[in-house]
Amino acid sequence: ASFVNFRNMLFNLSMIIMLLIMIFIMEGSLLGLSILFLLSNTFINIFSTLFLYKRNLHFIPSIKLISFKLFKSNLKLGLSFFLINISAIIMFSTDTLLISHLLGPEHVIYYALTLKVFIAFTMVQGFYIGPLWSAYSAKYLEKDFDWIQKTIKKSLLITLFLYLCILITISVFNHILNIWIGNSDYYNFDLIVAIAIYVSVRLWSSNFSTLLNGLSLTHLQLKTSIAATLLNIPLSIYLVKYTSLGIAGIAYGSAISLSIFAVIAPFYTYKILKRESYK
């Protein structure tokens, strides 16, 4: 996890340097920006690969080490993660399209500004929950279920603290807008509450999805992510068109769709840990 963070830092640093070169030396264009992004990504990936394999020779791929016995199980697991990620991309990218189509493009700015404030909490959560994926995997192989249970409890406590921060953010949101964009013209209390609930559901779910990913248990996530994707669009359209929620209906539609996993996951996780601890 530390190496991945180091790699991401190098990528961001290289992008800043290349953007400065583009601003002061080259004529700015979308094509130029795309080329810089491609070059930066390519160079950093080459450097990261050489750096990693030079320090860890046993990580170098070899045909001799391929185990075709594991091919089917690895392909099944990889396909599950792929479908989960595709579902997430569809789920998280359709909201603005729905707003533009149902309410008009001028309403997108309300949603985008509000979401950018609250989505910061998922970034904060990512700092401590990201490394837990590999840690859960290691502890699962060691059969250290006490550590896993204690860690998930700590993660949930941190999530509760983030909920408190979200409540504070709701109460001062108009001041945040004034500081950020210079006015509070895009203040919409109903939308603020809806997005706060939507982000809260995501924070709660991330605790359990990270654990289940670490245990390579993707069955529940695959089913619920597909169900959420299929439910989200028609539900959001219904809430916008046939209720008085307006733009907030988009966020509520996403929150309700994600709640399928958020409700089932704690019980499923408890069942798995209880079963494994008695083996």
PLM feature spans:
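Membrane-interface helix-loop junctions in multi-pass transport and translocation proteins
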Residues: 1, 13-46, 219, 229-263, ...
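Helix-loop junctions and terminal segments of transmembrane helices
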Residues: 57, 118-142, 211-214
